[in-house]
């Protein structure tokens, strides 16, 4: 891998949509996925509202808002993550749920892709050891609310 260009985020709830938001503002292409299509659409709408709020408060320009919005795409399936450079899991704080996500996700990723968890309480070492790439597994914790922190 020569650099990070595309980031996949699993979980479109409060943390996941916030992570997708800041990644897009930072210039990365973002794929956002959720197990529930309605939550995925709600997450995209939340990002749009939060970007609009940032423009209204003069935190970002309209051009920056529009560029960030264009960088975010809904991913209906983890199959869409085949070319991401980094996959960030931001699902519920339950180890069995996170492990199930990694079991499904890792075989779909490139071998050089980095896998990250947003966990705040589960052992990152234990989660990484259960994947096919413990040496490319990291903890990447964001504080809430992500777009403001």
Name each model-derived stretch.
Residues 31, 73, 88, 138-140:
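Hydrophobic/aromatic beta-strand patches that form the interior of the parallel beta-sheet core
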Residues 38-39, 53-114, 121-122:
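Rossmann-like NAD(P)-binding element
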Residues 4, 27-28, 83, 110-112, ...:
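Short coil/turn connectors at secondary-structure junctions
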Residues 24-25, 81, 145-147:
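Short, flexible turn/loop "capping" segments at secondary-structure junctions
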Residues 20-22, 44-45, 99-102, 127-129:
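Short amphipathic alpha-helical segments
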Residues 114-149:
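Rossmann-fold dinucleotide-binding core
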Residues 1-53, 57, 108:
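NAD(P)+-binding Rossmann beta1-loop-alpha1 motif at the extreme N-terminus of oxidoreductases
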């Amino acid at each position: 891998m020569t650099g990070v260009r595309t980031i996949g985020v699993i979980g479109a709830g409060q943390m996941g949509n916030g992570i997708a938001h800041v990644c897009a503002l930072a210039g990365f292409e973002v794929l956002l996925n959720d197990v529930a299509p309605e939550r995925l659409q709600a997450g995209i709408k939340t990002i749009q509202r939060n970007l609009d709020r940032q423009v209204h408060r003069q935190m970002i320009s309209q051009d920056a808002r529009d560029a960030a919005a264009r960088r975010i795409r809904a991913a209906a399936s983890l199959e869409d993550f085949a070319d991401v450079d980094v996959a960030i899991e931001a699902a519920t704080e339950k180890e069995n749920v996170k492990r199930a996500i990694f079991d499904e996700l890792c075989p779909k990723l490139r071998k050089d892709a980095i896998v990250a968890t947003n966990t705040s309480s589960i052992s990152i070492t234990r989660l990484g050891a259960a994947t096919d790439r413990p040496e490319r597994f990291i903890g990447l914790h964001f504080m809430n609310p992500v777009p403001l922190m």
